[in-house]
Amino acid sequence: MLDDDLPVWVPIPALAEIQIALETAVANVTELEGFELKRIMRTGTVATIDNRNWELREHSGPVQRLSQSRAIALDMESATIAANGFRFRVPYGTLLCVSDKPLHGELKLPGMASDFYKTQVASHLRIGIQAMEILREMPLERIHSRKLRSFEETAFL
């Protein structure tokens, strides 16, 4: 639906300002730092795909493209948030709670995921709220990223 505004071949960059706020919030909530923090958290670009059942079919093509893109995860909803944030020049970011690894033969089934969600949802909510509080305290000019500007737009305000 957004292909005219943002073709599928256009990468949507991760915004460092948002990632730093999320990483700070994760460190505060989990009380981890250094390698221990990096062990549980990855930051970067999240890719998407237009086929919800891609992992159930032959997927060597999508896997190769995703690997070459250096994406750290695949998520349809995060892509929608990023695409619209990018399109409307609104800072964007998502905090994903990874509960399945389809490429490793670990599909998320309803019963298998319930324990994971019980333990993770509350901490992710605290992390999200704290990240928004960190961002709220930042001056607007710091939150606004140059990555939200296109090639034809002036690089500086």
Model region roles, listed by residue range:
Residues 1-157:
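Accessory terminal and edge-of-domain segments that mediate assembly/interaction
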